[in-house]
Amino acid sequence: MKILSLYCGAGGLDEGLKQAGFKTTLAIDINKDACETMKLNHDCEVINGKVSDYESSFGDFDIIIGGPPCPEFSRANKNRTFNSCEVDLFWSIVDRIKPSFYMMENVQDVIRVVNRDNYLVNVSDYGVAQDRLRRIFTNLPLPKSRNKKTLYDVLGNTGFDYLTDFAFPNRNQKCPSRNMSEISMTLTTMKHFYLTSIPIYTRKYLPKEKHVWLNKDKTSLTNGKPCREITHKERAMIQGFPEDYVFYGNDVSIRKQIGNAVPPPLANAFFSQIQIPITVLNKGNAK
């Protein structure tokens, strides 16, 4: 089956289809880093450009997916104006090509300008460890709720030895010259080390009293359970990406790619329902 992925971003929808047994044929996005991420994870043709510049060249496809960027509808945008932005272009392509299946994902308020069959879903019902409402436009039926997960289910076994893909690349190493499972009984030689990296099972060696280092350039430990920022890998796993999914770009770019992505388990839940008709299979094999 031929699959067209419009506004593919980091490939959340594509990964969901992949897990359901499908493979994207052509993907397009205006963001260069997102396109590189797609290339690293999906064996398909990827175009870095505007959908409007290529729409007339799109031929027949069996499935069309996409998540058009529409910040006008985001509730985080306090100056919202309800224009149709890229969604009209998405639907014009769907209406022209007439694929067997289609799916558009967006924020819930996009319903104000789109009069199509849709579902308002909470991604937590489909194996994503988030309470997040999304609007899904598709000709597929609403899948049953499945695989509810907590953050512990997703991140509980991520381990400690190395904080790979940490937001700051110079902070992902173990404590210099010693294993953190055998940390010093005192903090004299570790005073300026990043204490937020110390795992729970070794914190018994830390001073019991609470204390703070009032220096903006030094680590501050205020209680027995210091918190660190989650890594990019952990952010992606919370979105439902597999642990080995690779993201391309700098810190800010990767954060945006992960945050804007459609959770793969959501797409997987919808497309794993497809029982492909023989006529569709023959149509796909003939191309």
Spans of model-derived segments:
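Extreme N-terminal starter segment of soluble prokaryotic enzymes
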Residues: 1-4
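Class I SAM-dependent methyltransferase "Motif I" SAM/SAH-binding loop
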Residues: 6-10, 258
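Conserved SAM-binding loop of SAM-dependent methyltransferases across substrates and taxa
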Residues: 10-22
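Conserved acidic E/D residue at the C-terminus of a beta-strand in Rossmann-like folds
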Residues: 28-31, 105-106
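Short alpha-helix immediately C-terminal to the canonical SAM-binding loop
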Residues: 32-36
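Conserved SAM-binding strand-loop segment of SAM-dependent methyltransferases
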Residues: 43-51
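Class I S-adenosyl-L-methionine
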Residues: 53-63, 68-212
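C-terminal target-recognition/interaction regions appended to catalytic cores
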Residues: 159-287
